[in-house]
Design a protein with these regions (language model features):
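ABC transporter nucleotide-binding domain
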Residues: 199-287
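Catalytic Walker B motif of ABC-type/P-loop ATPase nucleotide-binding domains
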Residues: 181-185
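Conserved catalytic motifs of ABC-family nucleotide-binding domains
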Residues: 177
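Conserved ABC ATPase "signature" region
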Residues: 12, 24-32, 103, 123, ...
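Short, charged/small-residue-rich alpha-helical element at the C-terminal edge
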Residues: 255-326
Length: 332
């Protein structure tokens, strides 16, 4: 697998020294004369490999080390320890050939110039990456069509909606046709329709150009829609690297059964068929063990006045919350 890896991290570690300062004038003087530090272990011994064309989700709570890892893989931070190769280059050397092959999109940062049309930023990026005029027009046309931005690129960025600005940010970041995309919360703050549009674009871009993508997101719908494989990081340590289905099977040994009944029933009448999570009128939601699911569904159909029944995976948010609540179980 490592021979095929486009992104390779080996024992990647980043520690920060954070200065400690007491309040008050005396504390300021002590801080100036006898400065003390606290060591923050942001990332500790992270290793993984990503093959060409993979879309991998990178999950973790705030402060887990996701963004720090991305910054090391894009060369913005030098690691305290460890090695990395991205598209055949050591990231923190920041070689010109390396920068042409990668891009980093952060949902809380922007490169578009606020008071100018997005097209001006695109032309600036084209000059930086030495994209010929003919190729520039072709790429802008392709990406604008994929993103639904036709007619929007000549408006000042400040007049675009949040969703349109994020799409324009993606267009600017992908103008040089990078091989490896690092997407850090690309749907942050977007409404549901804009989130779906960005997800569909990422899927289409990966299919059309075979790009390798490492995606962080707090919106589990992004991960479920785009990623078959996930990395889970917590307190700077990698807890899980594998299939999303494997994570679900390990931390959600149950399926969700949604029922529409012919008449309302009390919660007590449903307890014999599974763990009752919700009852509202004629609708109910039960958790049923994966083992023996078929038999349990047959009992439900036989013992309850069912008008409609749907079996689903539990919400990914619930599964991830369980992972972070019991990290030792993941490591074990």
């Amino acid at each position: 697998m490592r021979l095929e890896a486009v992104v390779l991290a080996q024992d990647l570690t980043k520690h920060f020294r954070v200065a400690l300062k007491e309040e008050s004038l005396l504390g300021t003087l002590r801080h100036f004369l006898f400065r003390q530090y606290r060591l923050v272990r942001a990332v500790e011994g992270v290793s993984f490999a990503i093959r060409r064309g993979e879309v991998v989700g990178f999950l973790g709570p705030n402060g887990a080390g996701k963004t720090t890892t991305l910054k090391m893989l894009t060369g913005l931070l030098h690691p305290t320890r460890g090695e990395a190769l991205v598209a055949g280059h050591v990231p923190w050397r920041r070689e010109k050939a390396f920068l042409r092959k990668i891009t980093l999109v952060m949902g809380n940062k922007q490169q578009l110039i606020w008071d100018l049309p997005a097209m001006d930023t695109l032309r600036l990026n084209a000059a930086i990456y030495e994209v010929p005029e003919g190729e520039f027009r072709k790429r802008v046309g392709e990406l604008a069509e994929m993103l639904g931005l036709e007619g929007k690129l000549h408006q000042p960025v400040r007049k675009l909606s949040l969703g349109e600005r994020m799409k324009a940010e993606l267009l600017a970041a992908l103008l040089h046709r990078p091989e490896v995309l690092f997407l850090d919360e690309p749907t942050l703050g977007l409404d549901v329709n804009a989130q779906v549009a960005v997800r569909e674009f990422v899927r289409a871009y990966n299919a059309r150009y075979g790009a390798t993508i490492l995606l962080t997101s707090h919106y589990m719908a992004d991960i479920a829609a785009l990623c078959e494989r996930v990395l889970v990081i917590h307190h700077g340590r990698l807890l899980y690297d594998g299939a999303l289905e494997g994570l679900l099977a390990r931390f959600a040994p149950y399926r969700e059964v949604r029922l529409v009944l012919a008449k309302p029933l009390p919660r007590e009448a449903l307890k014999a068929f599974g763990e009752v999570r919700e009852v509202e009128g004629r609708e109910a939601r039960l958790l049923v063990p994966r083992a023996g699911l078929t038999e349990r569904v047959a009992l439900i159909l036989k013992g309850l006045p069912v008008e409609d029944l749907e079996v689903k995976e539990p919400p990914l948010e619930e599964v991830i919350a369980r992972v972070f609540q019991s990290p030792k179980e993941v490591e074990g």
